[in-house]
């Protein structure tokens, strides 16, 4: 990583909830709504967007902690905006405040921490696990 991001730097992801983003265990008339795992996926990618311009070739990021409150349901067809704001950066570890809104209200708030890693070193460690 060239330099750590500045506190206040943001990343954003926008999407429209599709059927593939809806809970898959709905039955008995349960409406199709955005499921929490997909919401977290978009929130994590918003955080990554804040860091991408600072990565060197061969760098990537991995999530190390996430804490999300899914506050409100969002139906299929609604637009969602996920935003991550840097609240702390120390070395390769970066912490974010998360928030997501649909067209009507805040649907999620939380905290995420990621770490910038060297892909080659990460792959080597993984290979050792595979070879056991």
Regions found by a protein language model. Name each.
Residues 14-18, 69, 113-115:
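Generic structural detector for well-ordered beta-strands
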Residues 2-35:
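Catalytic strand-loop segment that frames the active site of acyl-thioester-processing enzymes
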Residues 48-81:
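Hydrophobic beta-strand-centered segment that forms part of the acyl-chain substrate-binding groove
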Residues 6-12, 65, 79-81, 93-95, ...:
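Intrinsic-disorder/low-complexity, polar/charged segments enriched in Ser/Thr/Lys/Arg/Asp/Glu/Gln
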Residues 30, 34-38, 95, 117:
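Residues at secondary-structure transition points
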Residues 75-76, 85-132:
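HotDog/MaoC-like acyl-thioester-processing domains
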């Amino acid at each position: 990583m060239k330099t750590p991001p500045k506190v206040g730097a943001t990343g954003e992801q926008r999407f429209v909830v599709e059927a593939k983003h809806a809970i898959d265990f709905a039955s008995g008339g349960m409406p199709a709504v955005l499921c929490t795992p997909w919401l977290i996926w978009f929130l994590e990618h918003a955080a990554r967007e804040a860091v991408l311009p600072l990565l060197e070739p061969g760098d990537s990021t991995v999530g190390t902690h996430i804490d999300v409150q899914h506050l409100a349901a969002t139906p299929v067809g609604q637009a969602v905006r996920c935003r991550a704001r840097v609240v702390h950066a120390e070395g390769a570890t970066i912490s974010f405040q998360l928030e997501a809104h649909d067209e009507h209200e805040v649907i999620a708030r939380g905290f995420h921490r990621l770490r910038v890693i060297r892909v080659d070193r990460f792959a080597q460690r993984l290979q050792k696990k595979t070879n056991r």
